[in-house]
Amino acid sequence: MHFHERFDVIVVGGGHAGTEAALASARMGSKTLLLTHNIDTLGQMSCNPAIGGIGKGHLVKEIDALGGAMAVATDHAGIQFRTLNSSKGPAVRATRAQADRALYRAKIQQILQNQPNLRLFQQAVDDLIVGNDRVIGVVTQMGLAFEAPAIVLTAGTFLSGKIHIGLENYSGGRAGDPPSISLADRLRELPIRVGRLKTGTPPRIDANTINFDLMTEQKGDDPLPVMSFIGDVKDHPKQISCFITHTNERTHDIIRGGLDRSPMYSGVIEGIGPRYCPSIEDKINRFADKSSHQIFIEPEGLNTNEIYPNGISTSLPFDVQLNLVRSIQGMENAEIIRPGYAIEYDYFDPRDLKNSLETKAISGLFFAGQINGTTGYEEAGAQGLLAGMNASLQVQGKEAWCPRRDEAYLGVLVDDLSTLGTKEPYRMFTSRAEYRLLLREDNADLRLTEKGRELGLVDDDRWAKFNAKREAIELELQRLRSQWIHPNSPLVDALNPHLNTPITREATFEELLRRPELDYPKLMSVEGFGPAIEDQRAAEQVQIQVKYSGYIQRQQDEIDKAIRHEKTGLPQDLDYQEVPGLSNEVIAKLNDHKPDTVGQASRISGITPAAISILLVHLKKRGLLRKSA
């Protein structure tokens, strides 16, 4: 049975990747269908109730700069906001928000329901329709076929999902939801490498049974940060505190005593878990010398008693979970509302994807989110936006687009995945970006919004606000560069008390701002140097661009040099066995990864600069040197 309408793009899955994919495609004018097994769970935060953090917050800002929904929803749902690394340089500062699950889900659903060109339909997908190595459509659980020339698959942890609590296990996509078995079996028939990964979640605790007086209170920042570039503090709901407590030696003894019934330590779970979000069992095992581990007690919302104890993700049996929770200070009488569990699921090797996130094997089929081996809402949302955008571009007969590593953390994410692949759930960090001084949270809009507008992702309201901010920055920078102060100027008497060394030569206002003892607000507070621009984000940008201009230019020079190699394309049918001088190890790795460009090849582990030089010489001799599209 065929559905009575055809679509341009079909998105399968309504999590963070799926919602951003569907919204991106629809914003670009493509007739889009979002298929989900349950419309009520669209935008569900399946694990921790938080958005942002180191590296992750950068991705959220980039999603926002390209017109996405995640930051906007966070501003309307965030019940505690903090800027991490606030005492460090701007490159590693990151915004993190504790979110009310219900408010976040409601805002995402509101955005979806009001998006032109987007249809929602509740049905699980069981099969793909493929012909001549091209996707044609999907078939749902009830045998209903939907047709579209582009499909974005965002199945999360649902593909052959198996939930583990102790030595007991059962099939599930997440607690309370069925897995996608038929779809997983169908995907395993495709010529794409498949593996198993694992993630986990902690038990949820009843707040009424916690003694918060025995814990350390952690308040949000004041003034409150805002996640979206078009957001406002007025969007935020009521703000509340989180709390901090710790495990202890008794906790660790309880965990060690239960390891014989742990699915991870008894060989029941095959999948590899996230290195940077380990279970409490892993922490006790890997860091045996530590006598305690920090636990963040995070509220799940304003109108619920559920608490998320961040730091004790576990799949131990329920009796062990209860004992370990009650061994922790402040939770001696705690009651568990939902047990913690581990979930094992299929993922597909992202090296089998183009950097547009289209599969190399099946035209028109795009993968985004945990299906590509990543972990985290932010990583999923960023991939979803890119996949939905490129699906729409393909349908429109336009060229695919993906930012370079020097343009966005999204570019770093996709390049890492498609070039290097991953054997464990991939999480974004600022340390993964070699050009992180340019890839800051604060300038994500300046880096990406103009491109987003060109692609059709950015609406008129966001575009107008962006242009006003950009113009304010440029005008203020011009003013600071063009205004001078002389040693004999009457302004000097007001300025010198703020300086470590008095002015002895004439200088521009820009040169004054470069002094370490001055910041933009302080300089503008001195009589004769104002007025300051009113937009605080624009003012922050002025200060950063002035103070870091030398470092920024140096990094830009490095990028220009790297781009020359980055754009040198490699033929997909190139037989590396025929390249004289390459070692067997290098040949094997190049044949395995099949990089699209010399830049990608250079980032494969074990590929030396000498090997790249040999490759370039071979390409030149054979007349195969070409620039990538």
UniProtKB/Swiss-Prot annotation:
GO cellular component, one term: cytosol
Compartments in which it is found: Cytoplasm
Gene3D superfamilies assigned to the protein according to its UniProt record, in alphabetical order: FAD/NAD(P)-binding domain (3.50.50.60), GidA associated domain, C-terminal subdomain (1.10.150.570), tRNA uridine 5-carboxymethylaminomethyl modification enzyme MnmG/GidA (1.10.10.1800)
Pfam families from the UniProt entry: GIDA, GIDA_C_1st, SAM_GIDA_C
Keywords: Cytoplasm, FAD, Flavoprotein, NAD, tRNA processing
List of residues binding NAD(+): 273-287
Entry-linked PROSITE patterns: GIDA_1, GIDA_2
Cofactor: FAD
Source organism superkingdom: Bacteria
GO molecular function: flavin adenine dinucleotide binding
Any one GO BP annotation for this protein: tRNA methylation
UniProt main location, coarse: cytoplasm
HAMAP family: MnmG_GidA (MF_00129)
Family: Belongs to the MnmG family.
Protein's name in the database: tRNA uridine 5-carboxymethylaminomethyl modification enzyme MnmG
Organism in which the protein naturally occurs: Shewanella loihica (strain ATCC BAA-1088 / PV-4)
Lineage: Bacteria, Pseudomonadati, Pseudomonadota, Gammaproteobacteria, Alteromonadales
Gene expressing this chain: mnmG
